[in-house]
Amino acid sequence: MSTTTRIKAKDAIDAFIADYISPTSVIESDTTEIIVTAITDFNDPQFRDYLMGLPVTFPLDTVRKCLAILSAFVPDGKQRAIYSVLAQFAWEAGDDTLAETYLTLALNEDAGYSLANLLKRVFATGWERESFVTMRIQLHPKVIEALDDTVIGS
Protein backbone atom coordinates (compact mmCIF):
# COMPACT_ATOMS: atom_id res chain seq x y z
CA MET A 1 0.00 0.00 0.00
CA SER A 2 1.18 3.50 -0.79
CA THR A 3 2.51 5.73 1.94
CA THR A 4 2.57 8.80 -0.25
CA THR A 5 0.55 11.62 1.25
CA ARG A 6 -0.92 14.56 -0.60
CA ILE A 7 1.50 17.00 1.03
CA LYS A 8 4.47 14.68 0.36
CA ALA A 9 3.43 14.48 -3.31
CA LYS A 10 3.12 18.28 -3.48
CA ASP A 11 6.61 18.72 -2.04
CA ALA A 12 8.00 16.11 -4.45
CA ILE A 13 6.56 17.76 -7.57
CA ASP A 14 7.77 21.18 -6.40
CA ALA A 15 11.27 19.77 -5.83
CA PHE A 16 11.23 17.97 -9.19
CA ILE A 17 10.40 21.16 -11.08
CA ALA A 18 12.88 23.24 -9.08
CA ASP A 19 15.57 20.63 -9.79
CA TYR A 20 14.59 20.55 -13.46
CA ILE A 21 15.04 24.33 -13.67
CA SER A 22 18.33 24.39 -11.77
CA PRO A 23 21.43 23.75 -13.90
CA THR A 24 23.28 22.17 -10.96
CA SER A 25 20.64 19.97 -9.32
CA VAL A 26 20.27 16.24 -9.66
CA ILE A 27 16.74 14.85 -9.66
CA GLU A 28 16.35 12.20 -6.98
CA SER A 29 14.72 8.92 -8.03
CA ASP A 30 12.61 8.77 -4.86
CA THR A 31 11.12 12.13 -5.85
CA THR A 32 9.91 10.76 -9.17
CA GLU A 33 8.61 7.62 -7.44
CA ILE A 34 6.48 9.72 -5.07
CA ILE A 35 5.11 11.80 -7.94
CA VAL A 36 4.31 8.79 -10.11
CA THR A 37 2.53 7.13 -7.18
CA ALA A 38 0.41 10.25 -6.72
CA ILE A 39 -0.39 10.69 -10.42
CA THR A 40 -1.14 7.00 -10.89
CA ASP A 41 -3.86 7.10 -8.27
CA PHE A 42 -6.65 8.66 -10.29
CA ASN A 43 -8.95 8.43 -7.25
CA ASP A 44 -7.24 11.44 -5.70
CA PRO A 45 -8.34 14.51 -7.64
CA GLN A 46 -6.82 16.79 -5.00
CA PHE A 47 -3.28 16.11 -6.22
CA ARG A 48 -4.37 16.31 -9.86
CA ASP A 49 -5.87 19.72 -9.11
CA TYR A 50 -2.58 20.74 -7.52
CA LEU A 51 -0.82 19.81 -10.77
CA MET A 52 -3.29 22.01 -12.65
CA GLY A 53 -2.26 24.94 -10.47
CA LEU A 54 1.51 24.55 -10.85
CA PRO A 55 1.78 27.40 -13.40
CA VAL A 56 0.95 29.80 -10.57
CA THR A 57 4.38 28.99 -9.13
CA PHE A 58 6.40 27.86 -12.15
CA PRO A 59 6.41 28.92 -15.83
CA LEU A 60 3.79 27.08 -17.89
CA ASP A 61 6.37 25.84 -20.42
CA THR A 62 8.51 24.38 -17.64
CA VAL A 63 5.53 22.66 -16.04
CA ARG A 64 4.50 21.22 -19.41
CA LYS A 65 7.99 19.82 -20.00
CA CYS A 66 8.24 18.32 -16.51
CA LEU A 67 4.82 16.68 -16.65
CA ALA A 68 5.53 15.31 -20.13
CA ILE A 69 8.71 13.72 -18.75
CA LEU A 70 6.84 12.29 -15.77
CA SER A 71 4.04 10.94 -17.95
CA ALA A 72 6.49 8.41 -19.39
CA PHE A 73 6.84 6.85 -15.92
CA VAL A 74 3.11 6.50 -15.25
CA PRO A 75 1.92 2.96 -16.02
CA ASP A 76 -0.31 2.33 -19.02
CA GLY A 77 -3.94 2.47 -18.02
CA LYS A 78 -3.25 5.04 -15.29
CA GLN A 79 -2.36 8.08 -17.43
CA ARG A 80 -5.77 9.75 -17.89
CA ALA A 81 -5.15 12.35 -15.17
CA ILE A 82 -1.74 13.48 -16.41
CA TYR A 83 -2.90 13.41 -20.05
CA SER A 84 -5.87 15.61 -19.13
CA VAL A 85 -3.66 18.11 -17.31
CA LEU A 86 -1.23 18.13 -20.25
CA ALA A 87 -4.17 18.68 -22.62
CA GLN A 88 -5.27 21.70 -20.60
CA PHE A 89 -1.77 23.17 -20.55
CA ALA A 90 -1.23 22.60 -24.29
CA TRP A 91 -4.57 24.27 -25.02
CA GLU A 92 -3.68 27.24 -22.81
CA ALA A 93 -0.39 27.58 -24.69
CA GLY A 94 -2.26 27.68 -27.99
CA ASP A 95 -1.12 24.23 -29.14
CA ASP A 96 -4.56 22.92 -30.10
CA THR A 97 -3.21 19.89 -31.97
CA LEU A 98 -1.22 18.66 -28.98
CA ALA A 99 -4.13 19.45 -26.66
CA GLU A 100 -6.43 17.27 -28.77
CA THR A 101 -3.83 14.50 -28.86
CA TYR A 102 -3.53 14.42 -25.07
CA LEU A 103 -7.29 14.67 -24.66
CA THR A 104 -7.81 11.74 -27.05
CA LEU A 105 -5.27 9.67 -25.09
CA ALA A 106 -7.09 10.43 -21.82
CA LEU A 107 -10.52 9.61 -23.26
CA ASN A 108 -9.24 6.44 -24.95
CA GLU A 109 -8.06 5.29 -21.56
CA ASP A 110 -11.30 6.22 -19.78
CA ALA A 111 -14.19 7.64 -21.81
CA GLY A 112 -15.95 8.60 -18.58
CA TYR A 113 -13.08 10.53 -16.99
CA SER A 114 -14.73 13.73 -15.77
CA LEU A 115 -11.84 16.17 -16.29
CA ALA A 116 -11.23 14.94 -19.84
CA ASN A 117 -14.93 15.30 -20.67
CA LEU A 118 -15.01 18.79 -19.17
CA LEU A 119 -11.99 19.79 -21.25
CA LYS A 120 -13.61 18.35 -24.36
CA ARG A 121 -16.60 20.64 -23.82
CA VAL A 122 -14.36 23.62 -23.01
CA PHE A 123 -12.30 23.14 -26.17
CA ALA A 124 -15.42 22.69 -28.32
CA THR A 125 -17.16 25.82 -27.01
CA GLY A 126 -14.13 28.04 -27.56
CA TRP A 127 -13.66 29.28 -24.02
CA GLU A 128 -11.15 32.07 -23.63
CA ARG A 129 -7.79 30.53 -22.79
CA GLU A 130 -7.31 33.15 -20.10
CA SER A 131 -10.32 31.71 -18.25
CA PHE A 132 -8.19 28.84 -16.96
CA VAL A 133 -5.45 31.21 -15.87
CA THR A 134 -7.96 33.30 -13.93
CA MET A 135 -9.55 30.23 -12.32
CA ARG A 136 -6.14 28.80 -11.45
CA ILE A 137 -5.03 32.00 -9.73
CA GLN A 138 -8.25 32.04 -7.70
CA LEU A 139 -8.40 28.32 -6.87
CA HIS A 140 -4.78 27.25 -6.40
CA PRO A 141 -4.40 28.72 -2.89
CA LYS A 142 -7.53 26.80 -1.82
CA VAL A 143 -6.22 23.59 -3.35
CA ILE A 144 -2.91 24.00 -1.49
CA GLU A 145 -4.76 24.69 1.75
CA ALA A 146 -6.70 21.44 1.34
CA LEU A 147 -3.58 19.30 0.83
CA ASP A 148 -2.95 17.27 3.94
CA ASP A 149 -1.42 14.08 5.26
CA THR A 150 -4.12 11.90 3.71
CA VAL A 151 -2.42 8.87 2.21
CA ILE A 152 -3.03 8.78 -1.51
CA GLY A 153 -4.72 5.56 -2.44
CA SER A 154 -6.22 4.92 0.98
What is the meaning of each model-derived region?
Residues 1-154:
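Charged, compositionally biased boundary regions
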